[in-house]
Amino acid sequence: MNKESKDDDMSLGKFSFSHFLYYLVLIVVIVYGLYKLFTGHGSDINFGKFLLRTSPYMWANLGIALCVGLSVVGAAWGIFITGSSMIGAGVRAPRITTKNLISIIFCEVVAIYGLIIAIVFSSKLTVATAENMYSKSNLYTGYSLFWAGITVGASNLICGIAVGITGATAAISDAADSALFVKILVIEIFGSILGLLGLIVGLLMAGKASEFQ
């Protein structure tokens, strides 16, 4: 009984703390907005002005960084899930360790996808003149590389997790019955295609973006 009440108190504490942070941020945003409104500076809160005044180089570099970063996180996460299960199951069945290394390779390919796309995107980062920095062409290139990088990075992140979970299941199933490995490997291959789809979509999104001028 004491243990259950202690668990309830801990969950209630976590619940209250998360809500406290949420309402604190909400109150700060509302107070700041009302302050700007009642002091005659309501026009300062202008998201469109923020987009137009922010350098397109920042958006492009941020998209490239997210592309590589999320892809590496997805690959590392998948390798962690697959590797821990493979090592644990390999204690009982050492024969599975070599065969299940293909799952680690599938996870590592996810990071390579992100690196390739980052290299392709970085080729558009040429030096622009100060007069044409905020031209329509440069703004489009910056926004395009930003959202394309997020698309590729998020796809590779999800792909790495999916391949990692499937690879872990394949290792455990192979330890119990070697005939199940090939069947689960087919599912793992379909999961790895998710990263390839994100790569193609990212190339299509940034395909019409010209170099900075």
From Swiss-Prot:
Residues 36-61, 122-144, 205-213 are cytoplasmic. The chain crosses the membrane at residues 15-35, 62-82, 101-121, 145-165, 184-204. InterPro entries: ATPase_proteolipid_c-like_dom (IPR002379), ATPase_proteolipid_csu (IPR000245), F/V-ATP_Csub_sf (IPR035921). The keyword Transmembrane helix applies. The record marks 108 as: Essential for proton translocation. Residues 1-14, 83-100, 166-183 are vacuolar. Keywords: Hydrogen ion transport, Ion transport, Membrane, Transmembrane, Transmembrane helix, Transport, Vacuole. It is found in: Vacuole membrane. Disulfide bonds: none annotated. One of its GO terms (biological process) is Golgi lumen acidification. It comes from the Eukaryota. The keyword Transport applies. It is a multi-pass membrane protein. GO terms for cellular component: fungal-type vacuole membrane; Golgi membrane; membrane; proton-transporting V-type ATPase complex; vacuolar proton-transporting V-type ATPase complex; vacuolar proton-transporting V-type ATPase, V0 domain. One of its GO terms (molecular function) is P-type proton-exporting transporter activity. Its main location: membrane. Proton-conducting pore forming subunit of the V0 complex of vacuolar(H+)-ATPase (V-ATPase), a multisubunit enzyme composed of a peripheral complex (V1) that hydrolyzes ATP and a membrane integral complex (V0) that translocates protons. V-ATPase is responsible for acidifying and maintaining the pH of intracellular compartments. V-ATPase is a heteromultimeric enzyme composed of a peripheral catalytic V1 complex (components A to H) attached to an integral membrane V0 proton pore complex (components: a, c, c', c'', d, e, f and VOA1). The decameric c-ring forms the proton-conducting pore, and is composed of eight proteolipid subunits c, one subunit c' and one subunit c''. Belongs to the V-ATPase proteolipid subunit family. This is V-type proton ATPase subunit c''. It comes from Saccharomyces cerevisiae (strain ATCC 204508 / S288c). The lineage of its organism: Eukaryota, Fungi, Dikarya, Ascomycota, Saccharomycotina. The gene is VMA16.
